[in-house]
């Protein structure tokens, strides 16, 4: 039976600084690289046939580290449909400072609402409108053919996909988050009915990755 694993990229430089990132193309921090290494370690027991990611380097780098850890050599498809939600004019701004300027309620609406559009950017609804068709047209056929798929992308593009796969409502998605570097496993039937959803647990204690290479 086919499986799908989704992974949010490791911590980025702007995650660390609490900045709105969106389509800004920033790199991973050393912590983010370690998160990707841990994800790769726990994914070693799983076989993947193909991987999908965005065109942003924090996701591409995370995927590269994961595949290096698993030892897999598989096709990789990069597409901007899997990019992070575009935060428009908020990109590069500190979230706390935005809250001070516009108020906490507006900050929460821009970050968590399904329909709220930041100036010059996308709502989560807009993000769904590109992520879900791409999944249906390009990724779902791979699963239907029995292939195991790995997707490494971003918090909001993956939340959009979670809404579709797990039938999460626009109201409930506001309370759903996805930690950096935490693999989420979807197991399907041969007819692509969803059988189970679970996180593949990362190590409870820090690992010396060098001993596992």
Swiss-Prot record:
One of its GO terms (biological process) is glycolytic process. The active site is at residues 9, 84. It comes from the Bacteria. The record marks 154 as: Transition state stabilizer. Keywords: Gluconeogenesis, Glycolysis, Isomerase. CDD domains: HP_PGM_like. Belongs to the phosphoglycerate mutase family. BPG-dependent PGAM subfamily. This is 2,3-bisphosphoglycerate-dependent phosphoglycerate mutase. It comes from Cytophaga hutchinsonii (strain ATCC 33406 / DSM 1761 / CIP 103989 / NBRC 15051 / NCIMB 9469 / D465).
């Amino acid at each position: 039976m086919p499986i799908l694993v989704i992974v949010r990229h490791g911590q980025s430089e702007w995650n660390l600084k609490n900045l709105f990132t969106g389509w800004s193309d920033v790199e991973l921090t050393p912590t983010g690289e370690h998160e990707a290494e841990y994800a790769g370690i726990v994914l070693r027991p799983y076989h993947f046939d193909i991987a999908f990611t965005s065109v942003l380097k924090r996701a591409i780098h995370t995927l590269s580290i994961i595949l290096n850890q698993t030892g897999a050599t598989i096709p990789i498809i990069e597409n901007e449909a899997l990019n992070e939600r575009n935060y428009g004019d908020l990109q590069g701004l500190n979230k706390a400072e935005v809250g001070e300027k516009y108020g906490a309620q507006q900050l929460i609406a821009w970050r968590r609402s399904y329909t709220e559009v930041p100036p010059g950017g996308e709502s989560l609804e807009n993000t769904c409108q590109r992520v879900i068709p791409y999944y249906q047209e390009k990724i779902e056929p791979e699963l239907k053919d029995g292939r195991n798929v790995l997707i490494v992308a971003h918090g909001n593009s993956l939340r959009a996909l979670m809404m579709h796969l797990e039938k999460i409502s626009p109201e409930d998605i506001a309370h759903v988050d996805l930690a950096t570097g935490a693999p989420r496993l979807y197991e399907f039937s041969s007819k692509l009915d969803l059988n189970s959803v679970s996180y593949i647990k990362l190590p409870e204690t820090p690992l010396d990755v060098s001993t596992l290479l």
